[in-house]
Amino acid sequence: MTRAVRVLLVDDDALVRSGLRMMLAGAERIDVVGEADDGRGVLGAVDLHRPDVVLMDIRMPQLDGIAATRLLRSQPDPPAVVVLTTFDTDELVLRALRAGAAGFLLKDTPPAEIVRAIELVHAGDGMLSPAVTRQLIALVAGEGGAPARHDGARELLESISPREREVALAVGRGLPNADIAAELHMSVATVKAHVSRLLVKLGVENRVQIALLVQDATDASR
């Protein structure tokens, strides 16, 4: 039997944490193992509870979710982070993803979609709500003042094998591993192996950052 995904809730609002806990209690493959009420408590809570996935609010009083995500992702063998917030401004989305978040969802996202996001990031996929995905692509495509980053991204994509590039481009379109496997006629295990190699070769932390790099490379080619 597959082990349940261990989840840590991080939000300064006790009512929000309680609501999330109640909602996730109905998901049989998810186990809420702990809570923290501020970004400063994340490292201690992670050490104590050893979660697989952290659901992280952005706006918190002492240490916000973006700084906490960056701090957490700098640790050895960190859990995946899904940012869950009422705010979906362009700047917040991009800052959270560049900090290492594997997903960005709004708090009004349907419960089933939140559960799916947790399961996807635990399996190594990324997760963005459709509205946030559209914003992100538009934002990165329109970012100015970063030609060096765009050129660097293009050079990185040119340095990998053609098959790895196909996988990277599919990740950049937001496809999960199963869809990439079907499209490129390979097994899911092979896709996972390609993604793992891409993380190392491209120097990024997760598949969402692969998608950001792909978009940067696309901008460099325009």
Per-region residue spans from a language model:
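Recognition helix of helix-turn-helix DNA-binding domains
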Residues: 173-209
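Receiver (REC) domain active-site loop signature in two-component systems and cognate sites
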Residues: 60
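Active-site beta3 strand of CheY-like receiver
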Residues: 49-55
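Active-site residues of response regulator receiver
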Residues: 57, 85
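Acidic catalytic/metal-coordinating carboxylates
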Residues: 38-41, 63-67
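Short, flexible helix-to-coil linker/hinge segments that flank and couple to helix-turn-helix
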Residues: 93-98, 108-162, 166, 216-219
